Amino acid sequence: MSKSFQQSSLGRDSQGHGRDLSAAGIGLLAAATQSLSMPASLGRMNQGTARLASLMNLGMSSSLNQQGAHSALSSASTSSHNLQSIFNIGSRGPLPLSSQHRGDTDQASNILASFGLSARDLDELSRYPEDKITPENLPQILLQLKRRRTEEGPTLSYGRDGRSATREPPYRVPRDDWEEKRHFRRDSFDDRGPSLNPVLDYDHGSRSQESGYYDRMDYEDDRLRDGERCRDDSFFGETSHNYHKFDSEYERMGRGPGPLQERSLFEKKRGAPPSSNIEDFHGLLPKGYPHLCSICDLPVHSNKEWSQHINGASHSRRCQLLLEIYPEWNPDNDTGHTMGDPFMLQQSTNPAPGILGPPPPSFHLGGPAVGPRGNLGAGNGNLQGPRHMQKGRVETSRVVHIMDFQRGKNLRYQLLQLVEPFGVISNHLILNKINEAFIEMATTEDAQAAVDYYTTTPALVFGKPVRVHLSQKYKRIKKPEGKPDEKFDQKQELGRVIHLSNLPHSGYSDSAVLKLAEPYGKIKNYILMRMKSQAFIEMETREDAMAMVDHCLKKALWFQGRCVKVDLSEKYKKLVLRIPNRGIDLLKKDKSRKRSYSPDGKESPSDKKSKTDGAQKTENPAEGKEQEEKSGEDGEKDTKDDQTEQEPSMLLESEDELLVDEEEAAALIESGSSVGDETDLANLGDVSSDGKKEPSDKAVKKDASATSKKKLKKVDKIEELDQENEAALENGIKNEENTEPGAESAENADDPNKDASDNSDGQNDENKEDYTIPDEYRIGPYQPNVPGGIDYVIPKTGFYCKLCSLFYTNEEVAKNTHCSSLPHYQKLKKFLNKLAEERRQKKES
């Protein structure tokens, strides 16, 4: 294009005030160049900058005219005379009268804000040397300036839905000016190109516009890294409020590039942040979703997303930045902000103010507040606050506050292990619904030592970092009211019970299991649950239990071809019997019973049998019968004594077993059984001396008198509590195998011959005198490969054995493997005998 055409174009544009920017095709760069001419006319730029603006106006005008566009640019010397006409460019009508009467400064500010520029952008541009600014590189410079501003860190005073009434409003320009801005934008930029970023309303009523803005932002790698700029005019303070002032609404856009640049954008402020910042700092659940984190300016849409956000490194970094902006604010008690506001007390991070001690008195009254800076980082070492500010408040509390841990097995042990090396633990409290724990040390120095250590060393629970700091809200933890004088037993609370799992179902004795733990210390008590393949062994001290656990962690424990899992029991700290101080005695009695089942003892049933046979062969069989009755009464008394001693322990063990696998046992208990309540109790029982009770029960059954029958019923009721592990002792199992098959073979001899000469079993004596068991209730001797009682295995969710209260998913396993097991056979025999007894009683009545 010729120079004359350019000059004539400029003349027409300066005289004609009705040119339309959209019709002329002016983009963002042309609009930005217009804004550069305004400060030149208003005297905000020096003389060199004015000449520079004139140069840029000429260059941009020439380039736009070459594309066929009609520019509305003017030189710096004539911009002051043509300001009103330039302001009207692109308008579809004259501006409101109130806007025309305003000063040039207000009009220029409106134009700059509408184009996405500010006076600070002009100041930045004025620092460039004149020889480096040319019409060719001016668009790139302007884009870099605008991108650099949008990349600055977000403000910390964003509002959010539902909570705007409790926070300080951000600074806004007067209402009439704001309406004029909106009117100007609405009239002037309806037909802008799609490449120009839209003007956004940051009222946070809707996140759709802002999210769309972030989607359309064009990030490039060639960002300006000239250094950090001062924000002297970014904030201003008033007497009672802390309002955030922005040069334009566009400075609230964008996300921070890094912590160094973030910290340079904010100045230290007095008092406390808005309530929305405090709530997000403590990670309180939002009232509704979607929710905008007022600290990070990040929208979240669910509880899971909110939990991940507050536990992330980005949120922790912004929280640390918030602490640096408000150095006087103490996040633990928030007294600098709420001054005892009851709402903040209810919304505190600890939902149990009645269990913990009273909060300490406020330290913010009467002077500037100096509060501790807890550890906020995920690694507990990267985001420490100024610990020296806490020295004046250390003596007020000895409670260590642990947050953001993940729950798992042995959680209490993991938490107490964090602070145990620093001193004696007086008390502790682990919250159920919130992942927070409070541990009270014996002295303040111990608590402070633990907190100081974890400011430099990461505190790990289950391999994941947690936050550890000294609680200033609670000085100590109250003890339960019912036990004011009871001392806290650290070893007792931590537990000394070893849990063995993945044990074989059968084929071993109690002593074989106890030998696994004997090398590590003295055994105080134990519970063996063969049907559940687990055992609980209580050691005399916790050190002995820990020694076994630590050793088995390093070297796997193998028992009868199975790798046994060994860990410290989380549910049971010790095995307590209902009768106090009987645990050791019962254990000794169990050991004595083991010794009683020696090879000599095994001969006693056979001797008794031979004596009975000899007495029956004599001419006076009544004498042998009297001897049998006496021996039966003696055995009954011994059995009754043993049962009265062991009944409390068995009941307790059944409760323990029910609590071991609550989820597993719930399905078994809630699903009804036709056998009755006694069979359910039988599944919950656990016994370690069943081998002796079986021969004694046989001796009881030899008594045919009515009194012995009543006593037999009592013994049977107690005995049914012990049916889960019939083979509790190896020797007992051998005795059962030696005596019961003999007795059952005698029954088989009775069936075809109807001969009463062979009465080795006391039950046959009873049947001979009073009643003979019908064939439908008879059961032959136990044979491992012959299943019995298959009718009691019924299909439900799987295949449920009503006798044993067990579920199986495989029918073959249920009806072949399970029904061929010894415990199932013994329960089937008991049940059939019970039915036969009930039928006999009905006939007698």
From Swiss-Prot:
GO terms for cellular component: nuclear matrix; nucleus. The modification N6-acetyllysine is found at K3, K522, K571, K834. Gene3D superfamilies: 3.30.70.330. Residues 147-174, 187-213, 342-394, 588-785 are annotated as: Disordered. There is a cross-link at residues 3, 132, 146, 245, 269, 478, 487, 491, 515, 522, 554-555, 617, 630, 717, 734, 768, 834 (Glycyl lysine isopeptide (Lys-Gly) (interchain with G-Cter in SUMO2)). Residues 653-665 have a biased composition (Acidic residues). It is found in: Nucleus matrix. GO terms for biological process: activation of innate immune response; blastocyst formation; heart valve development; innate immune response; post-transcriptional regulation of gene expression; ventricular septum development. Keywords: Acetylation, Immunity, Innate immunity, Isopeptide bond, Metal-binding, Nucleus, Phosphoprotein, Repeat, RNA-binding, Ubl conjugation, Zinc, Zinc-finger. The modification Phosphoserine is found at residues 4, 9, 14, 22, 41, 118, 126, 157, 164, 188, 195, 206, 208, 211, 234, 264, 275, 509, 511, 533, 596, 598, 604, 606, 654, 671, 673-674, 689, 745, 757, 760. Residues 160-174, 201-213, 600-643, 689-704, 765-778 have a biased composition (Basic and acidic residues). PROSITE patterns: RRM, ZF_MATRIN. This is Matrin-3. It comes from the Eukaryota. May play a role in transcription or may interact with other nuclear matrix proteins to form the internal fibrogranular network. In association with the SFPQ-NONO heteromer may play a role in nuclear retention of defective RNAs. Plays a role in the regulation of DNA virus-mediated innate immune response by assembling into the HDP-RNP complex, a complex that serves as a platform for IRF3 phosphorylation and subsequent innate immune response activation through the cGAS-STING pathway. InterPro entries: MATR3_RRM1 (IPR034928), MATR3_RRM2 (IPR034930), Matrin/U1-C_Znf_C2H2 (IPR000690), Matrin/U1-like-C_Znf_C2H2 (IPR003604), Nucleotide-bd_a/b_plait_sf (IPR012677), RBD_domain_sf (IPR035979), RRM_dom (IPR000504). One of its GO terms (molecular function) is miRNA binding. The lineage of its organism: Eukaryota, Metazoa, Chordata, Craniata, Vertebrata. The keyword Transport does not apply. The modification Phosphothreonine is found at T150, T679, T739. Transmembrane segments: none annotated. It comes from Rattus norvegicus.
